[in-house]
Every structure is written in C-alpha cells, then in structure tokens.
Curated annotation (Swiss-Prot):
Binding site for ATP: R125, T171
Protein name as it appears in the record: Hydroxyethylthiazole kinase
Known cofactor(s): Mg(2+)
The enzyme's E.C. designation: 2.7.1.50
Organism expressing this protein natively: Escherichia coli O17:K52:H18 (strain UMN026 / ExPEC)
UniProt pathway: Cofactor biosynthesis; thiamine diphosphate biosynthesis; 4-methyl-5-(2-phosphoethyl)-thiazole from 5-(2-hydroxyethyl)-4-methylthiazole: step 1/1
Gene: thiM
C-alpha cells in the first residue's frame, strides 16, 4: 500500500485557488462548533452560512458553492432539513461533505448516515472509528472520540471511497486522504488540537470548501488537512494552553499564503 505525501507546490496551488474562489459553504453543522467553524472558514478566506430551516436549507443548497452535513447534534427536525439539503445539492450538483460524528456509537445517526450515503457525498471526513463504522467494518469509538489508529482505517476508507465515489478523509495523528486508489498522508499538527472542541468539525467545513475548487480534488482536500495541521503547529508555539490556542489558530490560518506553502 503506497502512501504519497502532499508537496508544498500542491498545497500552495490549492490555497491560491481557495483564495481566488472564496467558496460559499452551507454549514449544517452541530450546535457546539458553529462559531468556531464559521471563523475558521472566514480566516482562510471562505464565506460560511448556517442555514438550518428545512425550506431554506433546500433553497440555499442550490445557491452555495458547497454543503457540509455534520450530524454531531442530530435531531429529527434537523435530519429532515439535512435530507432536504442533500437532495437539493444532488439536483443542483452542489458538492457536499458528510461528517459522521459518533456514527459508530449511536444507532439513529448511523442509520441516517447510511441513508445519506445513497446520495453519494463528494467527500466524507471522520476519525478512524467513524470511518470504519460507516464502512460496516466495525462499530466503535467512545462518543465523538476514536478508539482506533488512523492507519488502521485506510482499508475501510478505500472501500468507502470506491463504493460511494467520495474522497474519504481519516483524521488522526497522521491524516489519510483517499479516492479509493491513491492515498495521501498528511503529517503534522499537535495533540493540543484535540483539546479544543471543533477542530475536526471545522476541518470538515474546509474540506467541503475544497470540494468546490477546480483541479485535482484529492490534492485539494489533502491540502485542507495540511493547512489545518500547519496552523495548529504555529498556534501551539504561541499558546499556553487550549484557551489561548483558539485565537492563535485563527490568526495562523489568516496568515497562511501560497508563498509560505511553496
């Protein structure tokens, strides 16, 4: 199994495209992370929108550059709105990303996420336990936390990618991004990133934005992982703990440039 690395030139090119296109991302995400997710997108140069009313969600999915479905605080009314948005995204050919939070631990969301897979997400982003559960290989995870190493989920990610046509992202100490055939590994980041609520969910929003960019989608999505890890490293160097990490992280995202990547 060959795992390629993302080059600086590839990351720089993707960031140039990101700044050039400034994707409008329709974030149907969980209540805990909405502000952090929006600020992450803004810091990178995208435009976030949090539209959750069923009728509006369907309408907005046709307008947005990309759609994010994050099931972290799933309710039946929210599931109805998400379903409507995904169906409209499919009709409008709007790329959409699924973040199957805690899918291996809870039955209702697992059934809902499996239903959504039939609508062929453009990308799927989760931790190892979530990706393995979604692929039907194992049920695991401790709530939103993974109990598996990211590398162990690569076969599940490849299977899921081939079955759905999605780019699948497994996040962990090393992130792995695959289209079912190619695999890109992204090293970096810092353990402190796991002590702040929302870094993974925010990454899913950036992944969604990158799905709206032209060019090589696998490389664009892998670049999203690289930017977040890079910003995390820079933020940790300036932080004293989780409380000071968040503003430094947003600043680091803001300061990323294609020239720095290259």
């Amino acid at each position: 199994m060959q795992v390629d690395l993302l080059s600086s030139a590839q990351s720089a090119h993707a960031l140039h495209l990101f700044h050039q296109h400034s994707p409008l991302v329709h974030c149907m995400t969980n209540d805990v992370v909405q502000t952090f997710t929006a600020n992450t997108l803004l810091a990178l140069g995208a435009s976030p929108a949090m539209v959750i009313e069923t009728e509006e969600a369907s309408q907005f999915a046709a307008i947005a550059s990309a759609l994010l479905i994050n099931v972290g605080t799933l309710t039946q009314p929210r599931a109805q709105a998400m379903r409507a948005a995904v169906e409209q995204a499919k009709r409008s050919q709007t790329p959409w990303t699924l973040d199957p939070v805690a899918v291996g631990a809870l039955d209702y969301r697992r059934c809902f996420c499996l239903e959504l897979l039939s609508h062929k997400p453009t990308a799927i982003r989760g931790n190892a336990s979530e990706i393995m559960a979604l692929a039907g290989i194992a049920n695991g995870g401790r709530g939103v936390d993974t109990t598996d190493a990211a590398a162990n989920a690569i076969p599940a990610a490849q299977t899921l990618a081939r079955e759905t046509g999605a780019i699948v992202v497994v996040t962990g100490e090393v992130d792995y991004v695959t289209d079912g055939h190619r695999i890109i590994g992204i090293h970096g980041g810092d353990p402190l990133m796991t002590k702040v609520v929302g870094t993974g969910c925010a990454l899913s929003a950036v992944v969604a934005a990158c799905c709206a960019l032209p060019g090589d989608m696998l490389e664009n999505v892998a670049s999203a992982c690289h930017w977040m890890k890079q910003a995390g490293e820079r933020a940790v160097a300036r932080s004293e703990g989780p409380g000071s990490f968040v503003p430094h992280f947003l600043d680091a995202l803001w300061q990323l440039t294609p020239e720095v990547q290259a």
